[in-house]
């Protein structure tokens, strides 16, 4: 319990320091989303993914004072970061001792891509960062994505309907907060369910009824929400184009290196402990989701004024964080050896890059 409280205090204190700065930064998305919440509080419309704005308005409206929306945004995003680090600690502790889980979760709280040589000490733009500090919807969706990934790892095609309905509700909440991660997870999740179904399908037509119900409960609500969001975006003139690497090249002159610097720790765990890692279904799912997310990031773009926004990057950030977590789970369960210490050292290097990044955010440099 002490470890969780300590992690929560570190995460909360860091978040308060960062987010209070982000509200005043022209490079941050906080002010835009607070403006959306303010418009909603005064009877205006909502963006297609609106859960954060609704929460901000709901928390601030009873106070009805200047600055209440800003404080609500800081409170909600801080709570999300605290939830993320506590969930991370609990997941890693399932495979190892509390002390190791504590330090791993602490490192993951700050982990960012390793330093590069072409824009030192910048580590965010152009890389696949496991942590995001400037976009409130990405911050808030992370704990939901964490729970959703856990559900995806354990759900079977013959699960009780209440379990499938719970997973479907989580999927819907994630879509309404920020849909990108769900768009990368769903193909992998459905493929995993199909493979589990192939291995254990009961004989006869009756054997298909429960899997069909599970799929409907899982996909139905999210599919409806995604269709509604697509229609809203289409009405504003937004579109999707296949334009390989066009957006990514704007932010990285060395895309393969950017990718390697972003996933150095998970790659090291996979390479150094392959025999253990290959037996872990959650790790395989995490890698597959990241692959789909990176393909979306690399191939898709929004023509027009939103072209440079990189809105197809978001799924890869969330997916990479969850890959880092599952890689830490494998590593903490592995026997202590020089290989393990080498992998932990890489996580430390990722955390150091993140600490420098967070320090620059707090100092107002970024």
Which residues are covered by each model-predicted region?
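Short hydrophobic/aromatic helix or loop-helix immediately within or flanking a transmembrane segment
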Residues: 32-71
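Signature aromatic-anchored transmembrane alpha helix within multi-pass, membrane-resident enzymes
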Residues: 216-219, 332-361
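Transmembrane-helix motifs of polytopic, lipid-linked glycan transferases
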Residues: 71-98, 102, 147
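Hydrophobic/aromatic-rich transmembrane helices and adjacent perimembrane loops
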Residues: 183, 305-333
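Start-transfer (signal-anchor) and selected internal transmembrane alpha helices
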Residues: 1-16, 96-105
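Membrane-interface micro-motifs in multi-pass membrane enzymes
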Residues: 100-152, 255-260, 310-319
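Transmembrane catalytic cores of multi-pass membrane glycosyltransferases
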Residues: 20-32, 41, 49-50, 68, ...
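Membrane-interface alpha helices of multi-pass inner-membrane proteins
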Residues: 163-179, 185-186, 190
């Amino acid at each position: 319990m002490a470890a969780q409280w300590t992690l929560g205090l570190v995460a909360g204190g860091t978040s308060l320091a960062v987010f209070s700065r982000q509200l005043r930064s022209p490079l941050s998305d906080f002010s835009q989303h607070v403006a959306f919440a303010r418009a909603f509080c005064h009877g205006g419309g909502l963006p297609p993914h609106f859960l954060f704005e609704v929460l901000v308005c709901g928390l601030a409206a009873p106070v009805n004072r200047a600055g209440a929306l800003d404080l609500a945004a800081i409170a909600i995003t801080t709570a999300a970061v605290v939830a993320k680090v506590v969930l991370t600690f609990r997941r890693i502790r399932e495979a190892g001792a509390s002390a190791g889980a504590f330090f791993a979760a602490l490192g993951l709280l700050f982990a960012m891509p390793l330093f590069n040589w072409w824009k030192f000490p910048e580590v965010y733009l152009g890389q696949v960062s496991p942590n995001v500090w400037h976009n409130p919807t990405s911050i808030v969706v992370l704990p939901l994505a964490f729970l959703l990934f856990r559900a995806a790892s354990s759900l079977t095609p013959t699960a009780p309907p209440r379990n499938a309905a719970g997973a479907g509700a989580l999927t819907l909440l994630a879509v309404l907060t920020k849909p990108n991660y769900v768009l990368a997870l769903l193909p992998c999740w459905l493929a995993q369910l199909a493979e589990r179904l192939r291995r254990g399908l009961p004989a006869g037509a009756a054997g298909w009824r429960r899997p069909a119900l599970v799929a409907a409960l899982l996909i139905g609500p999210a599919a409806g929400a995604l269709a509604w969001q697509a229609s809203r975006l289409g009405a504003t003139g937004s579109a999707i184009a296949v334009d390989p690497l066009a957006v990514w090249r704007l932010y990285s002159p060395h895309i393969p290196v950017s990718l390697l610097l972003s996933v150095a720790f998970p790659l090291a765990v996979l390479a150094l402990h392959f025999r253990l890692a290959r037996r872990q279904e959650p790790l395989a799912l995490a890698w597959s989701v990241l692959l789909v997310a990176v393909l979306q990031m690399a191939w898709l773009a929004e023509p027009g004024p939103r072209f440079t926004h990189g809105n197809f990057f978001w799924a890869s950030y969330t997916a990479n964080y969850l890959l880092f977590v599952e890689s830490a789970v494998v590593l903490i369960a592995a026997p202590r050896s020089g290989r393990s210490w080498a992998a932990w050292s890489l996580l430390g290097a990722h955390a150091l890059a993140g600490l420098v990044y967070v320090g620059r955010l707090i100092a107002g440099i970024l």
